[in-house]
Amino acid sequence: MRRALVPLLAAAAVLAAAAPAYAAIPAHVKWKSSGAFAAWNNGGFIVYNNEWNHSAGPQTIWADSYRHWGVESTQQAGNTAVETYPCVQKNYDNPPVSSIRLLRNGFAESMPGNARGLDAEAADDVWLNNYNIEVMIWVDNHGQRPSGNVIGHATIFGQRFAVWHGGTDYTFALDHNETTGMTHIQASLRWLISHGYIPASATLTQVNFGWEIASTNSKAEDFKLTGYWLHTQRS
């Protein structure tokens, strides 16, 4: 679960204390912070250092834009519980999902390639009904297991997913890893509605893309987003 999600912030919102310079972080960036829950508004999006778990280790976020940003994160070796979810975030005014004709995004991301002990995944995190229903779409998984149990399999625009359900959470776990690609969020929501898992009256609250990080084997590791777009078309 990803808690303590930031609301839509004014342009002068959180700028926590800047982190010291690390070799892995670009020398000249527009914004950088090591503050938990630090956030930066850019282009109608929020780049968010979401260290939501109280036991999270240190994490420095940097950004040139909502399309190009990253984190250097150090999380305890052997940990399997998610500690942080640094992400790019878009807030919505709770339109009915049924009123959205198209909702999809494109991404280009990278995680530590050969890091031993890495436990993390890249994923969309979609919140419905004022944060009461959570739908995730995992695209690049290294060691994580969704909560709950498999309730079915979905083929969405040629991509095959195992669909998991636990509590009020749903996860579409891609059957292979992709570091660049596109996720069809609206089609995933329609699958859940058509199978009776979420109500047809569900509303869209928030869309995020980032990494759920549980462990970096107690080493500072780099996660980078080098391309991102989100397209929403209402009926």
Where are the language model's segments positioned?
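Conserved, mostly hydrophobic/aromatic
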Residues: 158
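Secretory targeting and sorting signals
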Residues: 1-23
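Short, hydrophobic/proline-enriched secondary-structure or compact coil segments at domain edges
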Residues: 69-73, 103-110, 124, 205-214
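Short, surface-exposed, low-complexity cationic segments
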Residues: 164-187
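Extracellular-facing segments of soluble proteins and assemblies that are Gly/Ser/Thr-biased and enriched
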Residues: 76-155
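Long, compositionally biased interface segments
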Residues: 179-235
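Active-site-proximal beta-strand/loop segments in catalytic clefts of secreted hydrolases
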Residues: 138-142, 166, 212
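N-terminal segment immediately downstream of the Sec signal-peptide cleavage site
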Residues: 24-72, 234-235
